[in-house]
Amino acid sequence: MDQRAITQDESGQFSFHQPRLQWSDFKRNADGMVPVIVQEEGSKDVLMLAYMNEEAFLKTVETGLMTYWSRSRNELWTKGLTSGHRQEVVSLIADCDYDTILATVHQIGGIACHTGAHSCFHNPIVSEDKLEQKSVDQENL
């Protein structure tokens, strides 16, 4: 089933249609927001984690530009309006519990983080070479 509210064709044209999910379908946190995991189209890099309230969700669906609620500034924030590093929506997909949105985006300028980095995830906690590979018993999932 196609869960996308907004799609972008190969020429870069957006196609907007009525989303299959409405804001009322989401399970929101105590502040009335839903976390959004932002992933770059193509590379599949995780760029950032942000939050949407209803107004941000509706504006994102309406414009095709990722819009969030800034918890620190208490205001609506369309990514890239001042920096030029816009995030154009490729798809919006809800997780199985309807409490998180995965946004696939076309990241303009290659920078998503306010620090100037490509991704907000650039502070290693445990390096891959230190992680032990463990097999998962699929029957016990």
Where are these regions (language model features)?
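C-terminal binding/interaction regions
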Residues: 2-33, 40-47, 52-141
